[in-house]
């Protein structure tokens, strides 16, 4: 991946929906070029995948990442973002990205899990619509411990 595109999309993500990520915009702005280059280079491996939606003009408009944490029985979805002007069923970006992640995750386990901030009802609704259900497990959001992260899971088989 081209690191300037990765950086631009990450900064857009953190500006648009700061509660959705475990990094602040201020922290991202402090990253050095070599860090962005490493992030772009290391996007996928045997136990992780990064997918991106890129328009015909080359603009990055969405991304999702998944990994199988060490010792975990299934994949975890994170780093989800679709640009506001590409959201919604008509655009199909979310479904296309998620379909690719699910295909990858299906080879690694029976479920796909995620954590979503309770203060992001749009995301919670989008995940529910796509078959994710809350497990009842919650955790404090690391950047604001007054908020909770809801664990959601989707069966893949």
Where are each of the predicted segments found?
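Short N-terminal alpha-helical targeting/association segments
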Residues: 2, 102-103, 107, 119
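Residues at secondary-structure transition points
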Residues: 31, 72, 88, 92, ...
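A generic structural micro-feature
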Residues: 3, 43, 72, 108, ...
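Acetyl-CoA-dependent GNAT
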Residues: 7-8, 12-85, 98-104, 140, ...
């Amino acid at each position: 991946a081209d690191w300037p595109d990765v950086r631009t999309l990450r900064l857009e993500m953190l500006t648009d929906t700061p509660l959705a990520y475990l990094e602040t915009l201020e922290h991202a702005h402090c990253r050095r070029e070599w860090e962005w280059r490493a992030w772009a280079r290391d996007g996928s491996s045997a136990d992780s995948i990064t997918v991106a939606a890129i328009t015909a003009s080359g603009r990055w408009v969405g991304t999702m990442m998944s990994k199988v944490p060490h010792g975990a029985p299934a994949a975890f979805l994170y780093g989800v973002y679709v640009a506001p002007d590409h959201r919604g069923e008509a655009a199909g970006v979310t479904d296309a990205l998620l379909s690719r992640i699910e295909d990858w995750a299906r080879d690694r386990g029976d479920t796909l899990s995620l954590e979503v901030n309770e203060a992001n009802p749009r995301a919670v609704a989008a995940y529910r619509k796509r078959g994710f259900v809350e497990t009842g497990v919650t955790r404090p959001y690391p950047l604001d411990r007054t908020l909770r992260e809801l664990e959601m899971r989707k069966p893949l088989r």
